[in-house]
């Protein structure tokens, strides 16, 4: 596909989790990543450019409606992380996240599981993070005890 659009993505070579957003001479927008994380981060960066907050779900930040979105013909950004591991540690989840999720979001499970972790993993992608130390208190059940959690995290 890259040959078909005559795009030079050599700047991505040798970089981990890097992405390139570039308006091509024909006006098409190229989103390319050095790996799957890089590609996802590029898509999420585009989402930020159009006004979607990484916290849109968690903080009820509704994106402002726009009638159009335009990037300049010269637009190009190449980004790669300067820190290898970037992420979050879910600590003391039994005081907040666990109770909220079991009472509001995953009532059928009575715990938090794949639906909640799907939102956590999306937030990680939106924040260009790659590391999650999941919940493990007895109240919330350890991450690995619910097989669907891993499927969500790997997708």
Regions from the PLM with identified roles:
Residues 1-80:
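Contiguous, structured surface segment used for ligand recognition
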Residues 2, 82-155:
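Aromatic-lined carbohydrate-binding surfaces of glycoside hydrolases
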